[in-house]
Amino acid sequence: MRTAEISRKTNETDIYLKLTVLKPYSKGKLTGSTGIGFFDHMLNSFASHGGFEIDLSVKGDLDVDGHHTVEDTGIVLGTALRKAAGNMAGITRFADILLPMDEALTMCAVDFSGRAFLAFDASFKSDIIGQYDTQLTVEFMRALAFNAGITLHIKSLYGENDHHITESIYKAVGKCIGKALEIHSDEIMSAKGCL
């Protein structure tokens, strides 16, 4: 089992996260809470479909808003993914998916390469889902990508319901990262010989 434990404390958040990368096709889960119900639901979707067990404790300045909580959770989760990947020997590296959630459809592609990049193309009709600011989806994904050291492309092709659009995004990203981290050999998947 590949695992990573990360603690991060700032004046805005105090986060502990333990990540376990499960065997391919295993169902993961989130244990713990961020204090933002809808965000917890999205993280559980990410974990379930990606094959990750995530033990999480977050204390954030929710009296201000959810920005620091969501972004910093992305920083810590990205850091944990990078640590759990180790030297990346044998990982599949590339993965992509078209993922439906009812009427919403998301396209996602990832390269677990050590090169951080995010392309994000999604729009929402509402500003808020529960206590979750829809603008924070891109902030979370940027923090995740840059701290994991992955190239991440996300495009919402269509959808009417913001809950479905957002959930489709989180599930697609989780699924892609889980697939990219599957181990198929002992070689590093790069013509350069390193990632």
Feature locations, PLM:
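Structural preference for solvent-exposed beta-strand-turn elements
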Residues: 1-195
